[in-house]
């Protein structure tokens, strides 16, 4: 199956934080994903784009913070993240582009 535009729209960007780096030692990779993406869609997109085998996908939604700038109250957008567990022996180098 070839990568489609939906696969590229599903995976927005890798999350590069201290916690995500620690998870990479457990064969897990963290991505920002589209808010309407399901776990099955995320797994299919990662498998197709990176040519790896996905064993599990966990998702979470981080609620946007309320911020104030010069007395005007605004709100940051909610962000959906996916923690993707790869099969044993598989890895993704997230420093290379898609």
From Swiss-Prot:
Q: Does the keyword Transmembrane helix apply?
A: no
> In the UniProt record, which is one GO cellular component term?
ribonucleoprotein complex
Q: Has the keyword rRNA-binding been applied to this entry?
A: yes
PROSITE patterns found in the cross-reference section: RIBOSOMAL_L23
User: A Pfam family for this UniProt protein?
Assistant: Ribosomal_L23
Give the highest taxon in the source lineage: Bacteria
What InterPro entries would the database entry show? Nucleotide-bd_a/b_plait_sf (IPR012677), Ribosomal_uL23-like (IPR013025), Ribosomal_uL23/eL15/eS24_sf (IPR012678), Ribosomal_uL23_CS (IPR001014)
Q: Name one GO molecular function term.
A: rRNA binding
**Keywords on record:** Ribonucleoprotein, Ribosomal protein, RNA-binding, rRNA-binding
One GO BP: translation
Q: How does it assemble?
A: Part of the 50S ribosomal subunit. Contacts protein L29, and trigger factor when it is bound to the ribosome.
HAMAP family, alphabetically?
A: Ribosomal_uL23_B
| Role noted for this protein | One of the early assembly proteins it binds 23S rRNA. One of the proteins that surrounds the polypeptide exit tunnel on the outside of the ribosome. Forms the main docking site for trigger factor binding to the ribosome.
Family affiliation: Belongs to the universal ribosomal protein uL23 family.
PANTHER family the record matches:
60S RIBOSOMAL PROTEIN L23A
Protein's UniProt name: Large ribosomal subunit protein uL23
What gene name does this entry carry? rplW
């Amino acid at each position: 199956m070839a990568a489609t535009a939906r696969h590229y729209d599903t995976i927005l960007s890798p999350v590069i934080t201290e916690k995500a780096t620690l998870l990479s030692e457990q064969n897990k990779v963290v991505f920002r994903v589209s808010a309407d993406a399901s776990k099955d869609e995320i797994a299919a997109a990662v498998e197709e784009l990176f040519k790896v085998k996905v064993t599990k996908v966990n998702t979470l939604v981080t609620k946007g913070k309320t911020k104030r700038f010069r007395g005007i109250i605004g709100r940051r957008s909610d962000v959906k993240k996916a923690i993707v567990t790869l099969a044993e022996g598989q890895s993704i180098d997230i420093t290379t582009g898609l």
